[in-house]
């Protein structure tokens, strides 16, 4: 087996992931943590190679790790431990890794593939695996090569765009969002539309205000489901203690502005007051407001509509959404239905995980199923 990589540094995306500590899996990862235009495609692979399988491999290499939160597992030392693990396993399996190399052409011949390398001899193989990743973070060499090659082999490509990416806001009526960089608030964000595109989802996580818009885990998660032109719905109250939150005996003497300042960071309270003040008498005491106005205010805070202008693109994205259409692949082997000698795995396929180690788990699981299928063909 030969691995060809155009990068000067091997496994660079692993190296930079998780702030340099590699969120190598999520111990709670399962089918519900993935999206695809072909829902359920990833289920088989995810059941065949579970987080506990990779955790066992990590432990066998005596790599210390810890859970950060919500099942996310990180190396105690650095991402280099995971890279070292993969290189050691490759050596054990007599895998040759050649990099940096430039692929000039890949041609299907009668019984094999011929891979021409710029300035080097060509290679031939009976099975070809495309594990090129997506287009996120082009600075480390990400490109559309895998997509272009798959298309050239007759496979359909679902539209791709940046995923797990911050959102931008440019309209004047939402300018307040960009005027409080650094402010963070735990919120619930609802996004998408059931039965359309990648469906609908809701995430209760932190949102971070930036000078361009919104970031933070809740926003990155929501970005996977968001479509251009859609609004997102923010529940600003979701993480607050709900008992007696609107008990008039407790809050009746306070104005809406004062309540906002009590519930939220000062700059966020000011921004919300600016937006709400266009429609409601926010300087009046809560007890002085009529029932209908109170209900409208509560509803507005629980389903606050924001319409992103866009996202911050591939340079700021963590993953690619979309990719090789899974209807052209066998879910048990990741084998192309157009050519039984071609396999496509990992991020190049239209399977995208949630934030928190799930995309690595898809990489491990899809690679495992592919490897088992190829191994079975070579069994005596």
What is each model feature region?
Residues 8-10, 15-16, 25-31, 64, ...:
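An anion/pyrophosphate-binding glycine-rich loop and adjacent beta-alpha core
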Residues 99-113, 165:
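A conserved short coil-to-beta-strand element within the FAD-binding core of flavoproteins
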Residues 19-69:
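Glycine-rich active-site loop/strand segments that organize a redox cofactor
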Residues 99, 274-352:
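A glycine-rich dinucleotide-binding beta-alpha-beta segment and adjacent secondary-structure elements
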Residues 91-103, 156:
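A conserved beta-strand/loop element that lines the FAD pocket in flavoprotein oxidoreductases
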Residues 134-153, 351-380:
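A conserved FAD-binding loop/helix module that cradles the flavin
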Residues 2-4, 103, 122-142, 150-151, ...:
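Short hydrophobic core segments
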Residues 42-50, 69-88, 98, 137-142, ...:
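Short beta-strand to alpha-helix junction loop
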